[in-house]
Amino acid sequence: MEAKAIARHLRVTPMKARRVVDLVRGKQATEALAILKFAQQGASEPVYKLVTSAVANARVKADREGQAFDEDALYITEAFVDEGPTMKRFQPRAQGRAYRINKRTSHVTVVVASKDEKGGN
């Protein structure tokens, strides 16, 4: 069984989010949650919530299909970060100048699947 969770327009730069996502890609879901809980990066909190949501989506999907659900059998099969829209802001500077500040956003996707399906991909 496969389940997906997507977080869009996260106010974290894609480069910083990718550092966090690379820590948990391919890991067991419960192990990934433990890693993210103690990670120092600011992007680890939204990714933690996203992995939790993906596990919950898998639980709902298993209940709906009448399958047995085992949280320990779930692995993160896919995890990637795409660049979202950039908010452009201006910082006033001396003598009438203005510097542009790019506030970048990210779209993060996490896919979890059972161990038996992980080997089939």
UniProtKB/Swiss-Prot annotation:
<keyword id="KW-0687">Ribonucleoprotein</keyword>
<comment type="function">
    <text>The globular domain of the protein is located near the polypeptide exit tunnel on the outside of the subunit, while an extended beta-hairpin is found that lines the wall of the exit tunnel in the center of the 70S ribosome.</text>
</comment>
<keyword id="KW-0689">Ribosomal protein</keyword>
<keyword id="KW-0699">rRNA-binding</keyword>
<dbReference type="GO" id="GO:0019843">
    <property type="term" value="F:rRNA binding"/>
</dbReference>
<comment type="similarity">
    <text>Belongs to the universal ribosomal protein uL22 family.</text>
</comment>
<dbReference type="GO" id="GO:0006412">
    <property type="term" value="P:translation"/>
</dbReference>
<comment type="subunit">
    <text>Part of the 50S ribosomal subunit.</text>
</comment>
<dbReference type="GO" id="GO:0022625">
    <property type="term" value="C:cytosolic large ribosomal subunit"/>
</dbReference>
<dbReference type="InterPro" id="IPR036394">
    <property type="entry name" value="Ribosomal_uL22_sf"/>
</dbReference>
<dbReference type="InterPro" id="IPR018260">
    <property type="entry name" value="Ribosomal_uL22_CS"/>
</dbReference>
<dbReference type="GO" id="GO:0003735">
    <property type="term" value="F:structural constituent of ribosome"/>
</dbReference>
<protein>
    <recommendedName>
        <fullName>Large ribosomal subunit protein uL22</fullName>
    </recommendedName>
</protein>
<dbReference type="InterPro" id="IPR005727">
    <property type="entry name" value="Ribosomal_uL22_bac/chlpt-type"/>
</dbReference>
<dbReference type="Pfam" id="PF00237">
    <property type="entry name" value="Ribosomal_L22"/>
</dbReference>
<keyword id="KW-0694">RNA-binding</keyword>
<dbReference type="InterPro" id="IPR001063">
    <property type="entry name" value="Ribosomal_uL22"/>
</dbReference>
<dbReference type="InterPro" id="IPR047867">
    <property type="entry name" value="Ribosomal_uL22_bac/org-type"/>
</dbReference>
<comment type="function">
    <text>This protein binds specifically to 23S rRNA; its binding is stimulated by other ribosomal proteins, e.g. L4, L17, and L20. It is important during the early stages of 50S assembly. It makes multiple contacts with different domains of the 23S rRNA in the assembled 50S subunit and ribosome.</text>
</comment>
